[in-house]
């Protein structure tokens, strides 16, 4: 098998869905910005050498339909000869796209692929515009369609995760994210997005241009008292609230994935080396625990132990789910999400895995660590985990 490297890995800042800066920015535009940004970070690479674009998207319809990867690649200015594919493994779609690119390169099917993900939760609702469940499953296994919030309630109930513990976890996520932003830790991975707005101005709306650079999810005004005051969002007697759940978000991310030999020939210094990727199925009604079963598989493929991993980016779908994974998988909490997670920074579904890849690579370099892991729970009852090596 050939060695595969990550030559660049970038993301847009993440906007709050519905009321945030990216609410009117199309997901294909966001993806194009991320693709262009990733390619521009590798000036030695002629775009004509890119053989494919793979983009993940959890709800690939409407503005993010029509094979959004192809639309975005053309919008990014890549040559028409560069083919493109959109893939979907729900929340791990962005990580899956990077793994698919790497595996294809490992087996000699390509030398250079751009991979990532995009999602506008402002434009495409959770579940898409028309949810049409399978009648047999509705009758025989209705939990296959259990809402994500209720799956988190199941995890919290079975594992005894208390409301205060979940809210404390959420508060720490905001505090770590704010510290990371103030310390400029995300600056290198973020590609700014220029956004036009129309603001009220009497009979003639005023056009305003802004350059969006900073994730807008983290809240400096939150507190444990404020979080504890929120009502349960999914079950009247539950513990899962809007405050201890991931934010609905808009964003995109992309990476240039290459064979090590081609990178060396072009004089490209790698950011990281791709090591392994694994998925696992689990009960849909406790889908948030999927990483517990994917992580050991990814470690085994890599020939590593959990103690070898220096940084872990665990997608914070819900605080209860995150605490459940940390407990059941035996993760070192000090290594998990050192710069905050999706509860503070947002979760643009199909983008997030690629976004977290950009983050884990930079954190490895700051810590002079060797191995980093990105791991995600997946709606429908799955987990995914990918391992990268600092170079």
Residue ranges and their predicted role:
Residues 1-27, 222-289, 293, 300, ...:
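Condensing-enzyme catalytic core mediating Claisen C-C bond formation in acyl metabolism
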Residues 10-13, 24, 28-33, 44, ...:
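N-terminal extracellular/periplasmic Venus flytrap/periplasmic-binding protein-like
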Residues 22-113, 118-135, 190-213, 285-286, ...:
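Conserved beta-ketoacyl condensing-enzyme motif
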Residues 27-43, 68-72, 97, 148-155, ...:
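Short, well-ordered amphipathic alpha-helical segments that serve as non-catalytic structural scaffolds
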Residues 57-110, 131, 142-153, 221-247, ...:
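Conserved catalytic cysteine-centered active-site region
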Residues 88-118, 156-186, 254-261, 326, ...:
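Active-site-proximal alpha-helical scaffold in enzymes
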Residues 119, 125-131, 147-154, 192, ...:
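Conserved N-terminal phosphate-binding loop of PLP-dependent enzymes in the Aspartate aminotransferase
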């Amino acid at each position: 098998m050939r060695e595969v490297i990550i030559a660049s890995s970038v993301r847009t800042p993440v906007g709050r869905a519905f009321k945030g800066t990216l609410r009117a920015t199309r997901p294909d535009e966001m993806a194009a910005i991320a693709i262009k940004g990733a390619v521009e970070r590798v000036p030695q690479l002629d775009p004509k050498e890119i053989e494919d674009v793979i983009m993940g998207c959890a709800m690939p319809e409407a503005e993010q339909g029509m094979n959004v990867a192809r639309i975005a690649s053309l919008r990014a200015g890549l040559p028409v000869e560069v083919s493109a594919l959109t893939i979907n493994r729900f929340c791990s779609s962005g990580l899956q796209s990077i793994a698919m690119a790497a595996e294809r390169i490992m087996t000699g099917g390509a030398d250079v692929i751009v991979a990532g993900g995009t999602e506008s939760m402002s434009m495409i609702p959770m579940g898409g515009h028309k949810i049409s469940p399978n009648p047999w499953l509705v009758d025989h296994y209705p939990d296959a369609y259990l809402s994500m919030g209720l799956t988190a309630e199941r995890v919290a109930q079975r594992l005894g995760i208390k409301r205060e513990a979940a809210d404390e976890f959420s508060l720490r996520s905001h505090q770590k994210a704010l510290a990371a932003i103030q310390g400029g830790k995300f600056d290198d991975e973020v590609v700014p997005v220029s956004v036009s707005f129309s603001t009220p101005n009497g009979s003639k709306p005023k056009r305003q241009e802004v350059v969006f650079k900073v994730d807008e999810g983290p809240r400096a005004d939150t507190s444990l008292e404020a979080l504890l005051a929120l009502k349960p969002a999914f079950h009247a007697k539950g513990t899962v609230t809007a405050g201890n759940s991931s934010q609905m978000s808009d964003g995109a991310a992309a990476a240039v994935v290459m064979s090590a030999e081609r990178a060396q020939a072009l004089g490209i210094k790698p950011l990281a080396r791709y090591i392994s990727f694994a998925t696992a199925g689990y009960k849909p009604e406790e889908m948030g625990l999927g990483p517990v079963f994917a992580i050991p598989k990814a470690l085994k493929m890599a020939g590593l132990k959990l103690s070898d991993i220096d940084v872990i980016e665990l997608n914070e779908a819900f605080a209860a789910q995150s605490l459940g994974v940390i407990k059941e998988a035996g993760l070192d909490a000090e290594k998990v999400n050192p710069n905050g997670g999706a509860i503070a920074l947002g979760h643009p579904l199909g983008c997030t895995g690629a976004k977290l890849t950009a983050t884990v690579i930079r954190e490895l370099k700051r810590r002079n660590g060797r191995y980093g892991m990105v791991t995600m729970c997946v709606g429908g009852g799955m987990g995914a985990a990918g391992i990268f090596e600092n170079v």
